[in-house]
């Protein structure tokens, strides 16, 4: 938790930023935006073998209930406005994980006329998970990296 000091009477001293970020890292609620085969690996990560619940990661069906969006798969031009609309409906603070080669940069379909060459052209991306499709372990590693990134951010303006 980043405890700075411990007093004799059982008090813990720390900063508000540390407490808020600790709470945020332990309760990530991702909304799935599964577009292709990467979504199957995302479902695999949420199943019993990897069990994202033990990390405080609980999948939510609504953008208004989630603070992380996992974009998994090929993003086509017709779907790009819907992605942005869903992103705008998420409450602040919000984070985006781009999962797979297609979401990262177009992947196998990079030169197709109807493909967005990376979801970072539509929404700001915090973590990129490589692979085609990436394994459940890679997604889990990406989410742990997102938790580390959240711990390092300042929440209170100085």
Curated annotation (Swiss-Prot):
GO terms for cellular component: plasma membrane; respiratory chain complex I. This is NADH-quinone oxidoreductase subunit B 2. PANTHER family: NADH DEHYDROGENASE, NADH DEHYDROGENASE [UBIQUINONE] IRON-SULFUR PROTEIN 7, MITOCHONDRIAL. It comes from Acidithiobacillus ferrooxidans (strain ATCC 53993 / BNL-5-31). One of its GO terms (biological process) is electron transport coupled proton transport. Keywords: 4Fe-4S, Cell inner membrane, Cell membrane, Iron, Iron-sulfur, Membrane, Metal-binding, NAD, Quinone, Translocase, Transport, Ubiquinone. NDH-1 is composed of 14 different subunits. Subunits NuoB, C, D, E, F, and G constitute the peripheral sector of the complex. [4Fe-4S] cluster binds at residues 37-38, 102, 132. It catalyses: a quinone + NADH + 5 H(+)(in) = a quinol + NAD(+) + 4 H(+)(out). The keyword 4Fe-4S applies. It is found in: Cell inner membrane. HAMAP family: NDH1_NuoB. It holds the Pfam family Oxidored_q6. NDH-1 shuttles electrons from NADH, via FMN and iron-sulfur (Fe-S) centers, to quinones in the respiratory chain. Couples the redox reaction to proton translocation (for every two electrons transferred, four hydrogen ions are translocated across the cytoplasmic membrane), and thus conserves the redox energy in a proton gradient. Its cofactor is [4Fe-4S] cluster.
């Amino acid at each position: 938790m980043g405890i700075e000091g411990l007093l004799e009477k059982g008090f813990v001293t720390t900063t508000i930023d540390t407490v808020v970020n600790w709470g945020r890292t332990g309760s990530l609620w991702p909304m799935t935006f599964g577009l292709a085969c990467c979504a199957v690996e995302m479902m695999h990560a949420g199943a019993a073998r990897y069990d994202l619940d033990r990390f405080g990661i609980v999948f939510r069906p609504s953008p208004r209930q989630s603070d992380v969006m996992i974009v998994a798969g090929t993003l086509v031009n017709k779907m790009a406005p819907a992605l942005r609309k869903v992103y705008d409906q998420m409450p602040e603070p919000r984070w985006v994980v781009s999962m797979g080669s297609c979401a990262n940069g177009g992947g196998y379909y990079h030169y197709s006329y109807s493909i967005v060459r990376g979801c970072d052209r539509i929404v700001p991306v915090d973590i990129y998970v490589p692979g085609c499709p990436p394994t459940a372990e890679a997604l889990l590693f990406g989410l742990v990296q997102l938790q580390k990134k959240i711990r390092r951010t300042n929440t209170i303006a100085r």
